[in-house]
C-alpha cells in the first residue's frame, strides 16, 4: 500500500482528496471510475490510509500504528468488500459486509472505510441495499466504489456519491518522466 506521494499522475484527484481531508469535508461515498489498472485501488487505499492516519501534517504519514496496519492490510477500520460469485456482487454481500457492519462504530479510527472493488458487478438488488446506507450513513462511514463503468450504477447512487474525476491511463511520457 502506498501513500499519495508514491502515486504517479492523478494529481487533480489526489488534490481533491487531500483537500477534502484538510478542510474536514470528507464525503460519505465516492465513486472512483476509470479503466482497469488505472490506479483506482492504489488511490483508494492511499485515501483510506490518510483518513485513518494518526500523524500530524501530511497524511498518510506511513509511520503511525494505523498507517503500518493499513500497509499490512490489517487496519480494522478499512474493510475490503469481497464477493462469493466471480461476476456478481449480490445483495447478501452488501448486507453482510456493509449494511450489517456499518452500524458498529470504528474500532480504533475516526472513520470506517469500505472499499468495494469492481463495484459495477453489483446487481440491482445489491445497489438498492447499498442505496439505503448511502442515503443515511453514520457520520464515521466512508464508502469507496471502484468501477470501470459508473454508468452501471443506479442514477440514485450516482447522485449521492462524489466522483472526483474519471481516471485515465498515464501516457508513456508521464510515466517515463517520473521513473
Each predicted region: which residue ranges?
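Helical "lid/switch" subdomain of P-loop NTPase nucleotide-binding domains
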Residues: 118, 126, 141, 149-153, ...
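Clamp-loader machinery-focused feature within the broader ASCE/P-loop NTPase space
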Residues: 2-125
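Residues immediately C-terminal
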Residues: 121, 136, 152, 163
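Single conserved hydrophobic/aromatic residue that forms the stacking wall/gate
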Residues: 169-172, 176-179
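Loop/turn-to-beta-strand initiation segments
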Residues: 110-113, 139-143
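Conserved catalytic/switch belt of AAA+ P-loop NTPases
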Residues: 128-139
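Conserved D-loop beta-strand region of ABC ATPase nucleotide-binding domains
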Residues: 146
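A short helix-turn-beta junction within AAA+ P-loop NTPase domains corresponding to the substrate/partner-engaging
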Residues: 156-166
Amino acid at each position: 500500500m502506498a501513500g499519495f506521494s508514491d502515486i504517479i499522475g492523478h494529481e487533480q484527484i489526489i488534490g481533491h482528496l487531500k483537500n477534502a481531508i484538510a478542510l474536514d469535508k470528507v464525503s460519505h461515498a465516492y465513486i472512483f471510475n476509470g479503466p482497469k489498472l488505472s490506479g483506482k485501488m492504489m488511490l483508494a487505499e492511499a485515501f483510506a490510509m490518510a483518513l485513518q492516519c494518526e500523524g500530524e501534517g501530511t497524511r498518510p504519514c506511513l509511520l503511525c500504528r494505523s498507517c503500518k496496519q493499513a500497509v499490512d492490510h490489517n487496519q480494522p477500520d478499512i474493510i475490503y468488500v469481497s464477493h462469493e460469485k466471480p461476476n456478481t456482487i449480490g445483495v447478501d454481500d452488501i448486507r453482510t459486509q456493509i449494511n450489517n457492519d456499518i452500524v458498529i462504530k470504528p474500532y480504533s479510527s475516526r472513520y470506517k472505510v469500505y472499499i468495494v472493488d469492481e463495484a459495477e458487478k453489483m446487481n440491482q438488488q445489491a445497489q438498492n441495499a447499498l442505496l439505503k446506507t448511502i442515503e443515511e450513513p453514520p457520520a464515521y462511514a466512508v464508502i469507496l466504489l471502484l468501477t470501470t463503468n459508473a454508468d452501471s450504477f443506479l442514477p440514485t447512487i450516482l447522485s449521492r456519491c462524489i466522483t472526483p474525476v474519471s481516471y485515465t491511463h498515464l501516457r508513456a511520457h508521464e510515466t517515463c518522466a517520473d521513473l
